[in-house]
């Protein structure tokens, strides 16, 4: 493969075949030319076709990111050329982002499980490769930080933040709220991750937040509570990027979109409510693990009075 005149080229028998200027796309196309239908890019696409209808939307979105990165890293490999040492190298390559590295490893393991089933490889090279240890997040967002970011958020993001906090649900579930899910009784959810069904009871605060959300783009009728000017639901990554910009504008660091759910469940417990029911967790242990990282014990200090009295008596 050669670079000339602003793009990549594949040369075979004296004939120059143009490839995309983008390196990752060029490598993927090069692999398909050299080993048509047998390269890693082809295997990943075929496996993705099998996976797409079997996983949750959030998982599928993560797999698509992993697929794009693996197509670049393994562009010149055929499936039978990938060895455990190559998988270990991929793990190390993405070590600075252990969460993403683990998603990539999980996806690659699934891809090769299909390759084994289709008898394209003898064994799965991902077996025996350990995942990175992911540090448990213990960041608690204070009320002041929440309000500071909300103040810098554009209107629909501010409304999403409010309803995410007041319902304690995952962002994907909040973005999926349909107008038909909202009633005087509350907001009905079917959690995408667990299929757990619950209704978050309507309160004065939640009702006000829903009312604010309904007036956004009210000239366009959409099926979902939150929608674009074209009537389509907002995508997760669109909202995440807008949220990150609001955090930067507010000067609040290390505030992730998912921290809204953690704050909601932690605050609910402190207010004497039922965080397990609000979070849709099957067991109390799941909720305790989720909240415990964000709770800090409050200890009372000793009083100086006794010390001062001792000093006075000694004098």
What are these language model-derived features?
Residues 99, 117, 159-162, 166, ...:
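C-terminal catalytic core of tyrosine-transesterase DNA break-rejoin enzymes
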Residues 212-220, 228-231, 285, 302-315:
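C-terminal secondary-structure termini that scaffold catalytic or DNA-interacting sites
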Residues 133, 191-195, 279-304:
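Catalytic-site neighborhood detector that most strongly recognizes the C-terminal catalytic loop/helix
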Residues 128, 136, 140, 144-148, ...:
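Conserved tyrosine-mediated DNA breakage-rejoining catalytic core shared by Y-recombinases
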Residues 203-252, 264:
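Active-site/catalytic core of tyrosine-dependent DNA strand-transfer enzymes
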Residues 102-104, 117, 121-122, 127-171, ...:
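Basic, Lys/Arg- and aromatic-enriched nucleic-acid-binding interface segment
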Residues 1-19:
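Short, Arg/Lys-rich segments that mark the N-terminal edge of DNA/RNA- and chromatin-recognition modules
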Residues 16-19, 37-40, 49-120, 137, ...:
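N-terminal core-binding DNA-recognition domain of tyrosine site-specific recombinases/integrases
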């Amino acid at each position: 493969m050669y670079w000339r005149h602003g793009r990549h080229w594949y040369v075979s028998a004296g004939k120059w075949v143009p490839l995309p200027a983008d390196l990752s796309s060029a490598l993927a196309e090069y692999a398909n030319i050299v080993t048509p239908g047998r390269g890693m890019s082809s295997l990943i696409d075929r496996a993705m076709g099998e996976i797409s209808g079997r996983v949750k939307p959030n998982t599928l979105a993560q797999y698509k990111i992993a697929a794009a990165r693996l197509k670049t890293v393994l562009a010149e490999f055929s499936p039978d050329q990938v060895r455990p040492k190559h998988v270990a190298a991929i793990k190390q390559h993405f070590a600075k982002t252990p969460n993403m590295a683990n998603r990539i490893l999980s996806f690659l393991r699934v891809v090769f499980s299909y390759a084994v089933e289709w008898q394209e490889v003898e064994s799965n090279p991902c077996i025996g490769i350990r995942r990175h240890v992911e540090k448990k997040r213990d960041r608690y967002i204070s009320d002041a930080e929440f309000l500071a970011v909300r103040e810098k958020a554009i209107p629909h993001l501010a409304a999403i933040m409010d309803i995410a906090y007041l319902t304690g649900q995952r962002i994907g579930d909040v973005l999926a709220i349909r107008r038909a899910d909202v009633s005087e009784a509350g907001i009905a959810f079917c959690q995408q991750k667990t299929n757990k069904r619950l209704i978050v009871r309507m309160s004065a605060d939640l009702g006000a937040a829903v009312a604010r959300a309904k007036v956004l783009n009210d000239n366009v009728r959409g099926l979902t509570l939150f929608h674009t000017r074209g009537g389509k639901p907002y995508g997760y990554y669109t909202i995440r990027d807008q949220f990150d910009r609001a955090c930067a504008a507010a000067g609040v660091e290390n505030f992730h979109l998912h921290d809204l759910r953690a704050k909601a469940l932690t605050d609910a417990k402190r207010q004497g409510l039922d965080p397990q029911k609000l979070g849709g967790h099957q067991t109390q242990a799941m909720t305790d693990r989720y909240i415990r990282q964000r709770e800090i014990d409050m200890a009372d200090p000793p009083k100086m009075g006794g010390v001062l009295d001792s000093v006075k008596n000694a004098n």
